[in-house]
């Protein structure tokens, strides 16, 4: 990816026991890092360690939505920043940030809670809102989920190439303006198409690997390493 890369920290669903819940780190060529979601618990710390990422490298994170397998690991990322005293920016919509703030204030030690707003800053985003992490520029968008308020995002790198993360649900045509012509497209897939009767992804607002494979060329996404 021409110095830009993705580190997958987990690919599992909410009930996964043999792998970690879906989350990843996005790296720019300049060395900036954005953590996207954090799974459902303190396993995120082990996943970062296994990937060779120090917790102190995580200064920015984006949370797509408030489901437990995406949100609760963020509590541990916040706690590490408060305990070891380094800055952290958390970007998301109002519901996620309200839950994060409330949970942290209820369960973290008071001496750490006192540093909220100083070391850890919650940044509220609206549909179409923008932010920057180092040399990467981001725009978030509402994926129009029918079950939970959720944001995806586009990331534009310093070389002009663009990545689109569709969030934790299948591509919605209402988001086409963001996904169209993205060089890299991150599309969820609950299971293979052959296993659809076994795992029933459609009942859970998910899709299969076949859908991801079909949507990618339709949206003119390359999904290849940049040489």
Label for each model-derived stretch:
Residues 35-39, 59-69, 93, 163-169, ...:
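Active-site neighborhood of phospho(di)ester-bond hydrolases with catalytic His/Asp-centered motifs
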Residues 2-50, 150-168, 184:
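Conserved beta-strand hairpin/beta-sheet module of binuclear metal-dependent hydrolase folds
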Residues 2-11, 106, 133-138:
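Short Pro/Gly-enriched beta-strand edge/turn motifs at strand-loop
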Residues 84-88, 96-122:
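Active-site neighborhood of divalent metal-dependent phosphoester bond hydrolases
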Residues 170-227:
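Cap/insert and terminal regions of metallo-dependent hydrolase folds
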Residues 16-18, 124-193:
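Active-site-proximal loop/helix segment associated with metal-binding centers of metalloenzymes
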Residues 42-91:
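Active-site metal-binding motif and surrounding structural segment of the metallo-beta-lactamase
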Residues 32, 84-88, 215-221:
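A short helix->loop->beta-strand "cap" motif at the edges of active sites that frequently abuts
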């Amino acid at each position: 990816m021409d110095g830009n890369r993705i580190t997958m920290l987990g690919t599992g669903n909410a009930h996964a026991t043999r792998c970690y819940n879906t989350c990843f780190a996005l790296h720019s060529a300049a060395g900036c890092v954005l953590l996207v979601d954090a799974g459902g618990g303190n396993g995120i710390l082990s996943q970062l360690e296994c990937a060779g990422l120090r917790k102190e490298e995580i200064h920015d994170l984006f949370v797509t939505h408030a489901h437990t397998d995406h949100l609760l690991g963020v509590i541990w990322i916040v706690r590490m920043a408060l305990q070891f005293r380094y800055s952290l920016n958390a970007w998301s919509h109002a519901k996620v940030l309200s839950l994060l703030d409330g949970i942290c204030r209820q369960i973290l030690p008071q001496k750490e809670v006192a540093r909220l707003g100083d070391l850890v800053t919650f940044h509220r985003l609206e549909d179409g809102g923008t932010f920057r992490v180092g040399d990467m520029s981001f725009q978030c968008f509402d994926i129009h989920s029918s079950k939970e308020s959720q944001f995806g995002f586009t990331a534009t790198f310093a070389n002009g190439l663009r990545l689109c993360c569709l969030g934790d649900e299948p591509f919605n045509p209402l988001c086409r303006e963001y996904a169209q012509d993205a060089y890299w497209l991150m599309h969820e897939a609950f299971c293979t198409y052959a296993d659809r009767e076994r795992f029933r992804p459609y009942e859970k607002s998910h899709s299969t690997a076949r859908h991801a494979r079909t949507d990618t060329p339709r949206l003119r996404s390359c999904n290849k390493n940049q040489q």
